[in-house]
């Protein structure tokens, strides 16, 4: 979602700030701005509605000089997307950028108005600027003012503050929204994501919950919310910003779909040895913890929730471990009973998903056996706060609609299933079949991608559709959910997914010639049941699009289009059948002319509730 970049140096920092914002564009935003202060305290602020490129053009027309600055990309929560609502916000000499939501902004706004402050935006962020300004007027340093202001805020925030009268210092505070400090030589930086700072540093300090940081060119001092100084470890990051340009592809999403064979190879690298899954990266004590697991609770949101749903079938049928999957935003607000020796698994591409993080923190109070994060970003909050972590190693994913992060999550989950089956002493053939399937998976997906042109032609049938229904059975039901999510995310077609056995319990009422029905049909023990469901749709004139195993025995006719898929090992079928649904959504979105990589109203990483 929103992005923050800050810098304090002896050189001009405007281009550093702009490049940092460019690297955060993939998260989604509607406006951008920056403010730079020179050594004499002269501040220049630029804000623009739209893309960072528009802000960069404005900076070329009105050059910004100064060694201290903060910048921001905004995803609207309070107040419409507009230049007036774009950050940074100013209260006299106080300048603020902020990620998150201040839940008590309305009473604070009224109190500040009563003190004579005038608001020029609809945002909750302007409250922070005026509040810090007020506290500074009561006396003390900027740090002391921030320490008094922060306890008055309720909600989530990652905020960076500067005082134009003292351009040698930046103040930062975080609670529920990530901030990372980048360490340089005679210069320091701060951002909401380390990716933004990779061009200028590889040394980072990740702020923890409640931290307040005072940053100058030559020092970084960190305090807890009582004002006591604390030490935080600095780390050397080997994270790569490997998105590059789009190359031969029209969109990042298309590129990332085609990267999946190599992404899965990267996920598997170093993790299969002598026909077994090797997850020794979990550390020497992991086997002791995992061997005690009697139940698994998975928390996730969005696409990650769908991957968790697939893995539930695997954990139960292949490892014999009961598994529940819950949307993180639901889990955190209900009273739940914790089962004996239950392992908490959290799934997140970014590792900063607000509800998933909150669920993880809650689980530590509830008595779970331990926690394991599956994530694509090393050093993210989810990874740092979990007992164990497995990286998906998918590489940077730019498209808001997740593709390779989803399939690599499933790859990691399936490896974990194999390891647990071995620890439980189950038949060795289970792990053998999983390893064999995973090793074959990249080439199977490459085979499938060769059918892209056929799927592109198929997508033309959806150009005038307003609704779509996806069906699947067993572990393909969550793949139907994922297919529907992809279609609605990027084409803006209303799409729903159902377990095919539920047709007669409601969805059948929707079937007519204008309702496309997309079915995933691998050749497994549920195929005959699925064929009966397909006949129910055909009998009512529904238009069927069936992605079917080449040996499943389907024949195309007037209202049933069969897209034959190469036969794949049953254990990897859910991962495999995801890819044609990704391509279908992509081509439909192309035809409809939507913004594929940054669909309206959506953000890559949901860091607020």
UniProtKB/Swiss-Prot annotation:
Keyword Cytoplasm: yes
Molecular function in Gene Ontology: carbohydrate derivative binding; glutamine-fructose-6-phosphate transaminase (isomerizing) activity
Coiled coil location: none
Domain Glutamine amidotransferase type-2: 2-218
InterPro entries linked to this entry: GATase_2_dom, GFAT, GFAT_N, GlmS/AgaS_SIS, GlmS/FrlB_SIS, Ntn_hydrolases_N, SIS_dom, SIS_dom_sf
E.C. number: 2.6.1.16
Biological process terms in GO annotation: carbohydrate metabolic process; fructose 6-phosphate metabolic process; protein N-linked glycosylation; UDP-N-acetylglucosamine metabolic process
Catalytic residue list: 2 (nucleophile), 604 (for fru-6p isomerization activity)
Reaction equations catalysed: D-fructose 6-phosphate + L-glutamine = D-glucosamine 6-phosphate + L-glutamate
Xref: Gene3D superfamilies: Glucose-6-phosphate isomerase like protein, domain 1, Glutamine Phosphoribosylpyrophosphate, subunit 1, domain 1
Main location: cytoplasm
Keyword Cytoplasm in annotation: yes
Swiss-Prot/TrEMBL keywords: Aminotransferase, Cytoplasm, Glutamine amidotransferase, Repeat, Transferase
GO cellular component, one term: cytosol
Domain SIS: residue ranges: 286-426, 458-599
Entry function: Catalyzes the first step in hexosamine metabolism, converting fructose-6P into glucosamine-6P using glutamine as a nitrogen source.
Subunit structure: Homodimer.
The protein's name: Glutamine--fructose-6-phosphate aminotransferase [isomerizing]
Gene name for this UniProt entry: glmS
């Amino acid at each position: 979602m929103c992005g923050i970049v800050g810098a304090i140096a002896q050189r001009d920092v405007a281009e550093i700030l702009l490049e940092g914002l460019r690297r955060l564009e993939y998260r989604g935003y509607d406006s951008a701005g920056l403010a730079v202060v020179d050594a004499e305290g002269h501040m220049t602020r630029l804000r623009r509605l739209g893309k960072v490129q528009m802000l960069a053009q404005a900076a070329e027309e009105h050059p910004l000089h100064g060694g201290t600055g903060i910048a921001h990309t905004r995803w609207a929560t309070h107040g419409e997307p507009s230049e007036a609502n774009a950050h940074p916000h100013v209260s006299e000499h106080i300048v603020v950028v902020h990620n998150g939501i201040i839940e008590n902004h309305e009473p604070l706004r009224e109190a500040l108005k009563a003190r004579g402050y005038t608001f020029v935006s609809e945002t909750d962020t302007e409250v922070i600027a005026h509040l810090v300004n007020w506290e500074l007027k009561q006396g003390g340093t900027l740090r002391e003012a921030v320490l008094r202001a922060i306890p008055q805020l309720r909600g989530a925030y990652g905020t960076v503050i500067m005082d134009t009268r003292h351009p040698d210092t930046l103040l930062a505070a975080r609670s529920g929204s990530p901030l990372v400090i980048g360490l340089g030589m005679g210069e320091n930086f701060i951002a909401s994501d380390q990716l933004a700072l990779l061009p200028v540093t590889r040394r980072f300090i990740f702020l923890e919950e409640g931290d307040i940081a005072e940053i100058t060119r030559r020092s970084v001092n960190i305090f807890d919310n009582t004002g006591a100084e604390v030490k935080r470890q600095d780390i050397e990051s080997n994270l790569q910003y490997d998105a590059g340009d789009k190359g031969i592809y029209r969109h990042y999403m298309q590129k990332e779909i085609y990267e999946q064979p190599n992404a899965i190879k990267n996920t598997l690298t170093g993790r299969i040895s002598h026909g077994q899954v090797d997850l020794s990266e979990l550390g020497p004590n992991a086997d002791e913890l995992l061997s005690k697991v009697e139940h698994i609770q998975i928390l996730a949101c969005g696409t990650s929730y769908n991957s968790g749903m697939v893995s539930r079938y695997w954990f139960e049928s292949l490892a014999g471990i009961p598994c529940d999957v819950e949307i993180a935003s639901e889990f955190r607000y209900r009273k739940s009973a914790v089962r004996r020796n239950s392992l908490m698994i959290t799934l997140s591409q970014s590792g900063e998903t607000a509800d998933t993080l909150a669920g993880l923190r809650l689980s530590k109070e509830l008595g779970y056996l331990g926690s394991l994060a599956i994530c694509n970003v090393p050093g993210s909050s989810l990874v740092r706060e979990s007992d164990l972590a497995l990286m998906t190693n998918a590489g940077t994913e730019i498209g808001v609609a997740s593709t390779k992060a989803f399939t690599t999550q499933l790859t990691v989950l399936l490896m974990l299933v194999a390891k647990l089956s071995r620890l439980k002493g189950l038949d060795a053939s289970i792990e053998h079949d999983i390893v064999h399937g995973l090793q074959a998976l990249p080439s199977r997906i490459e085979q499938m991608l060769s059918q892209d042109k056929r799927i592109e032609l198929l997508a033309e049938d959806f150009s005038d559709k307003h609704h779509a229904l996806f069906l699947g059975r067993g572990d393909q039901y969550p793949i139907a959910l994922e297919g529907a999510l992809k279609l609605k995310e990027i084409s803006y077609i209303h799409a729903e997914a159902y377990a095919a056995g539920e047709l007669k319990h409601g969805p059948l009422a929707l079937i007519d010639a204008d309702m496309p029905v997309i079915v995933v049909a691998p050749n497994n023990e549920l195929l005959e049941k699925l064929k009966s469901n397909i006949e129910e749709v055909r009998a009512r004139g529904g238009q069927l699009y069936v992605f079917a195993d080449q040996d499943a025995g389907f024949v195309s006719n007037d209202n049933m289009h069969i897209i034959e898929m190469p036969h794949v090992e049953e254990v990897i079928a859910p991962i495999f059948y995801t890819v044609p649904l990704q391509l279908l959504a992509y081509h439909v979105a192309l035809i409809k002319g939507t913004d594929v990589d940054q669909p309206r109203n959506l953000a890559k990483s949901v860091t607020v509730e």
